[in-house]
Amino acid sequence: MKKIWLALAGLVLAFSASAAQYEDGKQYTTLEKPVAGAPQVLEFFSFFCPHCYQFEEVLHISDNVKKKLPEGVKMTKYHVNFMGGDLGKDLTQAWAVAMALGVEDKVTVPLFEGVQKTQTIRSASDIRDVFINAGIKGEEYDAAWNSFVVKSLVAQQEKAAADVQLRGVPAMFVNGKYQLNPQGMDTSNMDVFVQQYADTVKYLSEEK
């Protein structure tokens, strides 16, 4: 009996120590108004955002978060249209096309690089070329671009940003209740930061 009690006490202490690593107002903040029906893990970004580029291509935040997520928990990425003017809106629609066709992984890097690195993306036609170079047929892209599904996905992205009162990117939300706060994490070492970021998402995804 004593051994069982000690084992249970050990589990409680381990849980307490784990929970103590994460503090509301430090690594994350709780939304004043939770969003019902929000994706389990939702990241907002813009191809015009330098920090988003760093998160994706240098730190690989998305990949590390996905690796840590509990089984059955899905991560969703939405593009915002409040950066880049009309081209930013075109990129939001193009991202909706990517989601509809399931080719997000194929176009993320070339879109980021075309906007920020080579600056070869300056029009909707340039965006279309990225998809074609990634192996998507032009007619397939055009059909998706003009489809009801894509229009719905554009509206969905815009509504999601409004629901959480999004003020900037990159930003990640969990269960429609919590927003990650990178400023409250250890940035002295990038590997440690990435690990802490991913671990915090995992912790919050398991919170009810």
From Swiss-Prot:
Cell compartments where the protein resides: Periplasm
UniProt xrefs under SUPFAM superfamilies: Thioredoxin-like
GO cellular component, one term: periplasmic space
Keyword set includes Disulfide bond: yes
Function in brief: Required for disulfide bond formation in some periplasmic proteins such as PhoA or OmpA. Acts by transferring its disulfide bond to other proteins and is reduced in the process. DsbA is reoxidized by DsbB. It is required for pilus biogenesis.
Primary subcellular site in the record, as a coarse category: periplasm
Record has Disulfide bond as a keyword: yes
Gene3D superfamilies, per the entry: Glutaredoxin
Domain of life: Bacteria
The protein, known as: Thiol:disulfide interchange protein DsbA
Record's signal peptide: 1-19
InterPro entries, A to Z: DSBA-like_thioredoxin_dom, DsbA/DsbL, Thiol_disulfide_DsbA, Thioredoxin-like_sf, Thioredoxin_CS, Thioredoxin_domain
UniProt lineage: Bacteria, Pseudomonadati, Pseudomonadota, Gammaproteobacteria, Enterobacterales
Family the UniProt entry places it in: Belongs to the thioredoxin family. DsbA subfamily.
The entry's keywords: Disulfide bond, Periplasm, Redox-active center, Signal
Membrane-spanning intervals of the chain: none
Paired cysteines (S-S): C49-C52
